Regions:
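Short, Lys/Arg- and Gly-enriched loop/turn segments at beta-strand edges
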Residues: 119-126
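His/Asp/Glu-enriched, well-ordered alpha-helical/loop segment
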Residues: 3, 7-20, 25-109, 113-115
Length: 132
């Protein structure tokens, strides 16, 4: 948490993107999962929110979901919810050069919206205005 706070303090929310490279086990119950393809992938174990190799001697990949990153930045990084969402939406869109269609709720933008509750638990998802 101290590193998160320092990074945002020095760079600002507009220069920090929250990004996840989570593997297939993200958001799934603890237990066995697969890293890579089903046919040629490596079996891993998800425990305590971490993916580990079966011998539990090394990490096997990230299981951090986007909502978890927003929650961590808000709670542990002590940033406002607006800043945390900005770092997950508009900052990455700007980095990718698609800030004219993604990253905001505004006329002319893609209606990609994630609705969450006060605990930052996902309640609804809309992609191009279509609820899923």
């Amino acid at each position: 948490a101290p590193l998160m706070k320092l990074a945002v303090k020095n760079k600002g929310a507009e220069k920090i993107a929250l990004v996840t490279d989570s593997m297939r086990g993200a958001g799934m119950p603890e237990g066995k999962s697969i890293l890579g393809s089903r046919e040629k992938g490596q079996e891993v174990i998800i425990e305590g929110g971490v993916a580990k190799m079966p011998d539990r001697q090394s990490f096997a990949g990230s299981v951090a979901t986007a909502d978890r990153l927003v929650r961590n930045m808000y709670q542990l990084g002590e940033r406002s919810i607006e800043e945390a969402v900005y770092m997950m939406s508009l900052t990455p869109a700007t980095i990718m050069g698609i800030q004219e269609q993604k990253g905001r709720i505004a006329k002319g933008y893609d209606a990609d919206i994630v609705v969450f509750n006060a605990d930052i638990q996902i309640q609804q998802v809309f992609i191009n205005g279509q609820q899923y």
